[in-house]
Amino acid sequence: MADLRIVAQHAESTGIDSLWFPEHVVFFREYRSRYPYSADGNPGFGRRQGVYDPLFACTVAATVTTKIRVGTSILILPQRNPIVLAQEVVAVDHASDGRFDLGIGIGWSSEEFDAVGVPWAQRGARTDEYLDVMQTLWRDEVADHRGPLLNFDNVIAEPKPVQNPHPPIWIGGGRGAPMRRAATHGDGWYGWAIATQEIAETMAELDRACEAAKRDPSTVGRKLGLPFGGSSDELKVYLDAAQRANVEEVVVSTGIGTDFLRQRMDELAMIDR
């Protein structure tokens, strides 16, 4: 945990805008599921791969910093209880003094869903309802909900988030359903591993998803996540393309290890953004 504190403080000192933490409850020696962000479908995880719970990591990072935003990239929402999660999110929002962003997705590993006992086939519908539940709890003084999975009346959920009405909700994933979900349930869309030459058309597709949902595209945020191991010049080309397409932020995934991360942060801070 000391390394996490060091990385967070170094990120803030270099002027990086935000830190994002992934979620996987467990990992597996082998996967039947196809990883959607690699050419061969292999996630490339090591045998001893592991990550802290992202809400815990966000809290630790927030409590040793004062300006940098922290977020989940991404939290696998359908694996969670939404009433419990709503309370946990409020706690992180308070611990960070309103510097928390909630990035969520439906997950890609059926093995992980099997392990935690959550039906894989229902994860999309479960995600939509859970988003409704959490936003109701954060917004209403006395909350009621009727849905196919959860029903409750006369519920008081306090305290409310620092950010009004709640921390920004970023819907993670690719095109199609995640974009439609962002347009109907989210504050923004968080795409992952979009090639430089595909950024403009991807943002145009997000605009169309918003228009189909009768929502002004300008009210839906745009964020891209980029697994990256190239040069600063190559990254600058990507950032320029993202900026032209009105992407608000690019989250750069560079690898693991405290010393390596600090070095990469120093390099990123030198890029003219």
Feature map (PLM): residue ranges:
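Active-site-adjacent structural elements that line small-molecule/cofactor binding pockets in enzymes
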Residues: 1-273
